[in-house]
């Protein structure tokens, strides 16, 4: 509410049109309210008065309601970096990632400790023959031979001096002949060793030899026949072991001469005779080939066991002489 002096001033300064040309005049008797304002109409053609002085500043009003938020101001300059905070607790493990690319070859590792001793290996191939040693002394005289047929009478000779001289001469000749025979035997023995080395084995009077060729059964049989021999036909464990050593040396399974081409299930020698020795692997012969063909021929493994196979298969050729 405006103070009283200011209200009077405003009323006095209002235009005549605003206040109206007529105003009611009240007597003092009717002004019973001390706050009643009495306004007098200005005389006609009167001059406008000066503006009154500003009134005193009124008391401070109550705080109004908050206005709406203003528009955001421009972004300020970036402040200095703060100090690094202390390390937070570890987070929970993330999901398993995809496998990375394959790494390169690493540096060689440290040598490991020696392993345990391995199993005993198979018997190696025979070593080369040694140099021929010096001739040994003559052996003891053998038993006398059978008596020969009586010869034709010779011409009568001159009278000898003594019979003792003739006997000594004959004894010396016999000793010389025995030494020559021993020398020839040593030469034959060394020659036999040279022939067998490195691809041959001898058992008794048999010799088993291979040239390393690999052929079908019929071609292998033909090759041995042309060499005046036949495919290996072991008839004892010693002969079977000799053939096995050649198989190990070449690291290839080999053909044996026996087959059951004439009668299924009955293996015989090339001469037609029945086997007097065999060394079949467990479950053999089974006559079951991979392509369902007949297994009429025989091979020997590196362990000495036998197995029946198809005759068209190619195996190592070992001939017997």
Curated annotation (Swiss-Prot):
PROSITE patterns tied to this protein: C_TYPE_LECTIN_1, C_TYPE_LECTIN_2
Post-translational modification as stated in the protein's UniProt record: Hydroxylated.
Any Pfam family: Surfac_D-trimer
Region of interest called Disordered, as start-end residue ranges on this chain: 43-163
Free-text function comment from the UniProt entry: Lectin that binds to various sugars: mannose = ManNAc > fucose > GlcNAc > glucose = maltose > galactose > lactose > GalNAc. Could play a role in immune defense.
GO biological process: positive regulation of phagocytosis; surfactant homeostasis
Gene: CL43
Disulfide bonds: 224-319, 297-311
Recorded superkingdom: Eukaryota
Any one GO cellular component localisation term in the record: collagen trimer
Domain Collagen-like: from-to ranges: 49-162
Tissue: Liver specific.
Gene3D superfamilies per record: Mannose-Binding Protein A, subunit A (3.10.100.10), SFTPD helical domain (1.20.5.360)
InterPro entries hit by this protein: C-type_lectin-like (IPR001304), C-type_lectin-like/link_sf (IPR016186), C-type_lectin_CS (IPR018378), Ca-dependent_lectin (IPR051077), Collagen (IPR008160), CTDL_fold (IPR016187), Surfac_D-trimer (IPR015097)
Protein family (similarity comment): Belongs to the SFTPD family.
Native source organism of the sequence: Bos taurus (Bovine)
Keyword Signal on entry: yes
Record-given protein name: Collectin-43
Comp. bias (Gly residues): 100-109, 124-133
Keyword Glycoprotein in annotation: no
Basic and acidic residues composition-biased segments: 47-65, 147-159
GO molecular function (one): D-mannose binding
Signal peptide: 1-20
